[in-house]
UniProtKB/Swiss-Prot annotation:
Subcellular localization(s) per the UniProt record: Cytoplasm
Catalyzed reactions: tRNA(Ser) + L-serine + ATP = L-seryl-tRNA(Ser) + AMP + diphosphate + H(+); tRNA(Sec) + L-serine + ATP = L-seryl-tRNA(Sec) + AMP + diphosphate + H(+)
Protein known as: Serine--tRNA ligase
PROSITE patterns, A to Z: AA_TRNA_LIGASE_II (PS50862)
UniProt gene name: serS
Classification via HAMAP family: Ser_tRNA_synth_type1 (MF_00176)
Entry EC no(s): 6.1.1.11
Length: 431
């Protein structure tokens, strides 16, 4: 969440920055916030006055007792003050709770260099790498190319319905090879520590990284035998959730930072609001695999860390020889918790366009504040860390890109040279 002191200092300025995000979207009830803040300040001021009065009366009671005076009236006043303070504390707790809940629905503030715009049309292309291949035969899409290789949507539909996949044989081997290759790049070349995390997490964990409470409809939640008394749990939509929350409620030493973590995991998304979009193939699935990168840094390190993380994702695409472009997302297209986001889009020949394959974001202290994760700075004070996350890469979409960019006229697939050791030296995939 954003720092509430920013809202208290200049609410209008914060609202102006938030208005650059996707509109129309009521992020904050400004009038309710002002009313609660006014009541909070009044309560805190009166509480301080009452506490001072009670201290004064306590001293007076001591003097009266020493002189044998009547303390009953003073004791009655002290008792009344105690009752008033108790009621005030209860109301203050209610106000703080309502303010906290309001903040949970407010997105992060975009950095100053983020392009301002309502949607993806305002995204800024930063660079391109590689040139799309020119084919001398009719290009086939990954569904047609993958079917003889074991990409089986008929079986997955029988098992689970739409937006699932069943891979076997060469397709499954390629999928496994890609994930292992991605992990090797990030751990062996870029210094990430490989992790294996739970795929089911508690509600407060999703609140920490910002999926809840705002985006519950995008999640799959878990019922333990229909027992609704059990703690609320969800399937992860990305291992960013579990990796980032691994440092929740901790105070880290400055020399521990940056922390760099990676994991290969399935991701589960309901795709609410995506009806009719990308219904064919692997592009948009309820369950897909991804290699995730997470960094925990100091505030001074995070801007450079984002640029390096983008490079870590680019390295995978370059080693695979896949053409791509890098976009700086606009204020209207970036995610809820992000202060700045780059998307990597890979060339998909059958669609003759670039499609997202990685998203790398600097969340600054937004998630850390929700998770209560701090580090001890050079002055010995506890300060919120910055968190970053990025895909390195989405495995299914990378499989799509390899099939389509490396296809041959006879339907076989040339194996990218970098993947051959992961596939027992195979040069081609064919039925």
């Amino acid at each position: 969440m954003i720092d509430i002191t920013l809202l208290r200092k200049d609410l209008d300025a914060v609202l102006a920055r938030l208005s650059a995000r996707k509109n129309p979207q009521p992020f904050l009830d400004a009038e309710r916030f002002r009313a609660l803040e006014a009541e909070r300040r009044t309560l805190q001021s009166s509480t301080e006055d009452l506490q001072a009065r009670r201290n004064q009366l306590s001293k007076q009671i001591g003097h009266l007792k020493a002189k044998g005076g009547d303390v009953a009236p003073v004791m009655d006043e002290v008792g009344g003050i105690g009752d008033t303070l108790k009621a005030g504390a209860e109301r203050l707790e209610q106000i703080q709770g309502e303010l906290g809940l309001m903040l949970m629905h407010v997105p992060n503030l975009p950095q100053a260099d983020v392009p301002v715009g309502a949607d993806e049309t305002a995204n800024l292309e930063v660079r391109r790498w590689g040139s799309p291949r020119e084919f001398d035969f009719t290009v086939r899409d990954h569904v047609d190319l993958g079917a003889p290789l074991g990409l089986d949507f008929e079986t997955s539909a029988k098992l689970s319905g739409a937006r699932f996949s069943f891979l076997k044989g060469p397709a499954a081997r390629l999928h496994r090879a890609l994930a292992q290759f991605m992990l090797d790049v990030q751990t062996q070349e870029h210094g990430y520590t490989e992790c294996y995390t739970p795929y089911i997490v508690n509600r407060e964990v999703l609140e920490g990284t910002g999926q809840l409470p705002k985006f519950k409809e995008d999640m799959f939640w878990v019922s333990r035998g229909g027992d609704e008394t059990q703690p609320e749990q969800y399937l992860i939509s990305t291992s960013e959730i579990s990796l980032t929350n691994s440092v929740r409620e901790q105070v880290l030493a400055a020399d521990q930072l940056p922390i760099k973590l990676t994991a290969h995991s399935p991701c589960f998304r309901s795709e609410a609001g995506s009806a009719g979009r990308d219904t064919r193939g692997l592009i948009r699935q309820h369950q897909f695999d991804k290699v995730e990168m997470v960094q925990i840094t100091t505030p001074e390190q995070s801007d450079a860390a984002l640029e390096s993380m983008v490079g870590h994702a680019e390295a995978v695409l370059q080693k695979l020889g896949l053409p791509y472009r890098v976009l700086l997302l606009s204020t209207g297209d970036m995610g809820f918790g992000s202060a700045k986001t780059y998307d990597l889009e890979v060339w998909v020949p059958a669609q003759a366009t670039y499609r997202e394959i990685s998203s790398c974001s600097n969340c600054e202290a937004f998630q850390a504040r929700r998770m209560q994760t701090r580090f001890k700075n050079a002055q010995g004070k506890n300060e919120f860390v910055h968190t970053l996350n990025g895909s390195g890469l989405a495995v299914g979409r990378t499989l799509v890109a390899v099939l389509e960019n490396y296809q041959n006229a006879d339907g076989s697939i040339t194996v990218p040279e970098i993947l051959r050791p992961y596939l027992g030296g195979l040069l081609e995939l064919r039925a």
